[in-house]
Design a protein with these regions (language model features):
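Cytosolic regulatory regions of ion transport systems
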Residues: 1-96
């Protein structure tokens, strides 16, 4: 299963690692490069981008994703905007 996780904080990072260990293809997305660097060798792909910028989504394989998880916890506004953009751009199951 191809899963994209937005937000690589404590929850998002541990979820990405667990889902990878169970055989899923996981793409992790965060706006902080240090978090991307921490996980980039442990999951399929890690991308540094601002998920509130709709134009940044061109780099993501959203159409191929089975599930999209929004794990942005510290910025509620960013989580809502990210969820709205994802809903507009793909038909994957969204967990937010």
């Amino acid at each position: 299963m191809k899963i994209i996780i937005f937000g690589l904080g404590n929850f998002g990072m541990s979820l990405a690692l667990s889902l990878t260990e169970t055989g899923n293809e996981v793409i992790g997305v965060d706006k902080q490069m240090d978090k991307v660097n921490l996980i980039k060798d442990k999951i399929s792909l890690a991308i540094c981008m601002d998920s509130t910028n709709e134009f940044a989504y061109e780099a993501l394989p959203l159409k191929d994703a089975d599930k999209v998880i929004v794990a942005i916890g510290e910025n509620e506004g960013a989580a809502i905007i990210t969820t709205a953009i994802i809903k507009k751009l793909c038909n994957a199951k969204i967990i937010s």
